[in-house]
């Protein structure tokens, strides 16, 4: 079992005490609030659930919660990793809550969700990395709200047996998302507990086991990567047959986290999106405020449509060859 980092290890991997750079105008958002926002907040509190919206200090929380959209975080609020960019607490997690799957299903039902995103902290302390809890949550949501489509955003299950991933694939989430987060060169400082090719291989394994499951991955920009490195990651993702790419600006949560090296301009995000589409991604979301689950439901609908068009194009091409 890997060592669980101490809660202050994020500080030692960043410029401790460095001031947070002032955000440019294109990153400014309205403060959260309003009746719909408070209703979503109240429901999540009532069911005792955590959301990545809060734990990761997402800038889009006001907009998403007002629209009755939230990304549920299972397996507790304490992570066994200490990624330098992440605002989630690090330490020794609590025991897995057996009531959690039912509570997530309650959220899907009470919010009348067409699409739900389920993520988790890393649980290196568990034999299967928490895979069985993902399966129970998927099954509970399907039983309660069969029409709700399900997207999961998973950890890397590094060092866990293959059956951990196998059981999730057999549960057939509609979208399997695992973020590469940054370019390989920056992994030792940004994702010290992870390995780039382990994460890439995870996405590839999902497609090998069930090609019908959509795969998705994302990068944070502004950590010191360069354009060619981002393009290489795109190529690696396409080699792994990833369908959907998300690109967003890294924002430093607190002074103890790794600092922002660059605020990437909206025009640069548009240029990256054009490159990604040219490389063959079925769906690309690329903007300063893009996050993995931002507009996830609408993007999933467009992703299905894009795949259908691609299949029809292939069928027409094959039909022409046989004529």
Curated annotation (Swiss-Prot):
InterPro entries given in the database record: Aldolase_TIM, Elp3/MiaA/NifB-like_rSAM, LIAS_N, Lipoyl_synth, rSAM
Cellular component, GO annotation: cytoplasm
The protein, known as: Lipoyl synthase
Species per Swiss-Prot/TrEMBL record: Zymomonas mobilis subsp. mobilis (strain ATCC 31821 / ZM4 / CP4)
Family classification: Belongs to the radical SAM superfamily. Lipoyl synthase family.
Record's subcellular location: Cytoplasm
Pathway entry: Protein modification; protein lipoylation via endogenous pathway; protein N(6)-(lipoyl)lysine from octanoyl-[acyl-carrier-protein]: step 2/2
Alphabetical list of Gene3D superfamilies matching this protein: Aldolase class I
GO function terms (MF aspect): 4 iron, 4 sulfur cluster binding; lipoate synthase activity; metal ion binding
Cofactor (UniProt): [4Fe-4S] cluster
Annotated cofactor note: Binds 2 [4Fe-4S] clusters per subunit. One cluster is coordinated with 3 cysteines and an exchangeable S-adenosyl-L-methionine.
Listed HAMAP family: Lipoyl_synth
EC number: 2.8.1.8
Pfam families, per the entry: LIAS_N (PF16881), Radical_SAM (PF04055)
Keyword Cell inner membrane: no
Gene, per the UniProt record: lipA
UniProt xrefs under SMART domains: Elp3 (SM00729)
Domain named Radical SAM core: residues: 65-282
Record field: catalytic activity: [[Fe-S] cluster scaffold protein carrying a second [4Fe-4S](2+) cluster] + N(6)-octanoyl-L-lysyl-[protein] + 2 oxidized [2Fe-2S]-[ferredoxin] + 2 S-adenosyl-L-methionine + 4 H(+) = [[Fe-S] cluster scaffold protein] + N(6)-[(R)-dihydrolipoyl]-L-lysyl-[protein] + 4 Fe(3+) + 2 hydrogen sulfide + 2 5'-deoxyadenosine + 2 L-methionine + 2 reduced [2Fe-2S]-[ferredoxin]
Residues where [4Fe-4S] cluster 2 binds: 79, 83, 86
